[in-house]
Amino acid sequence: MQAIADSFSVPNRLVKELQYDNEQNLESDFVTGASQFQRLAPSLTVPPIASPQQFLRAHTDDSRNPDCKIKIAHGTTTLAFRFQGGIIVAVDSRATAGNWVASQTVKKVIEINPFLLGTMAGGAADCQFWETWLGSQCRLHELREKERISVAAASKILSNLVYQYKGAGLSMGTMICGYTRKEGPTIYYVDSDGTRLKGDIFCVGSGQTFAYGVLDSNYKWDLSVEDALYLGKRSILAAAHRDAYSGGSVNLYHVTEDGWIYHGNHDVGELFWKVKEEEGSFNNVIG
C-alpha cells in the first residue's frame, strides 16, 4: 500500500511546504520549473494550434456563433460562505448546452472526502475531472501522512495543476470548502487560470449577481445554523428565478468540524411558492 501511495501521491516535502506560509516561494518555483508539481498532473495532449483557447471559443461560443456545432454544458449558480457554525454550500442543479436545458439534476458538489467539498461552475467535464483527480491526491496523502490534508494544501495543488494548462481552453470556477482544527472553516476559490483566493463569501456562475444580492443583504457572521441554511437556499432561489441558466433544485450542505452534512435536495418550484407565501416576496408573480 505504501508503494502505491508513493507512486501516485504528492511528495511529502511538497505537501509539508504547502501547509506553511511560504506560498510565494512555492509559486515562484513552480513557474521557473524548480517545483515537482509539474510531474503531478495527468498528461493531456494539447491541440497543435497557436491558441487552443481562441480555437475552442470560435467553435463553441454560442453568443457569437449561434450555429456552432459544439455546445458545451455551462450556466450555473454556486455559493459558499463562512459563519460561526461552519460553512454553508448551496448549488443549483441545472445544466444548459446552448439554448436548451441539458439536465435538471446535475450534482454540482464534488464530495472530495468526508471533510472537504468542491463546487462546479464552468465546463462540467473540466470541473468533474480535476476535482475527482484532486480527491485521489487527498486520499493518497491521508494514507501516507495518517492525517487529513489541509484545505490550503488541497486548493494549492489544484490551482498549480490547472495553471499548467492556462490558455488551453479549460473552463472551471470552483470553491474548495473544508474544516480542519488548525484552519477552522476555510473556503478557497480556484479557477482554470490558476487563480486562488481565500475568502468568507463566494458566489460563482451565471446567476451569481442575483445570489450575491440576497446573500450580501442578509449575511451575518453570527447566523444560527437554521438561518444560514435558509440563506443559502434563498440565495440560490433568487438566482434560479432570474437567471435562465440556473434552476432545477437546490442541493444544500453544511460543513462542520466533524465533517460535511447533506441537507437535502429542494425543488426550486416548490421552494418558490413556499418562500413567496412566507415572505410575501416575488410580488411580480401571480399564482
Swiss-Prot record:
Predominant place of localization: cytoplasm
* SUPFAM superfamilies for the chain: N-terminal nucleophile aminohydrolases (Ntn hydrolases)
Origin superkingdom: Eukaryota
The protein's enzyme class: hydrolase
* Oligomeric and partner information: The 26S proteasome consists of a 20S proteasome core and two 19S regulatory subunits. The 20S proteasome core is composed of 28 subunits that are arranged in four stacked rings, resulting in a barrel-shaped structure. The two end rings are each formed by seven alpha subunits, and the two central rings are each formed by seven beta subunits. The catalytic chamber with the active sites is on the inside of the barrel.
What's this protein's function?
The proteasome degrades poly-ubiquitinated proteins in the cytoplasm and in the nucleus. It is essential for the regulated turnover of proteins and for the removal of misfolded proteins. The proteasome is a multicatalytic proteinase complex that is characterized by its ability to cleave peptides with Arg, Phe, Tyr, Leu, and Glu adjacent to the leaving group at neutral or slightly basic pH. It has an ATP-dependent proteolytic activity. This unit is responsible of the chymotrypsin-like activity of the proteasome and is one of the principal target of the proteasome inhibitor bortezomib.
Q: What is this protein called?
A: Proteasome subunit beta type-5
Q: Which gene encodes it?
A: PRE2
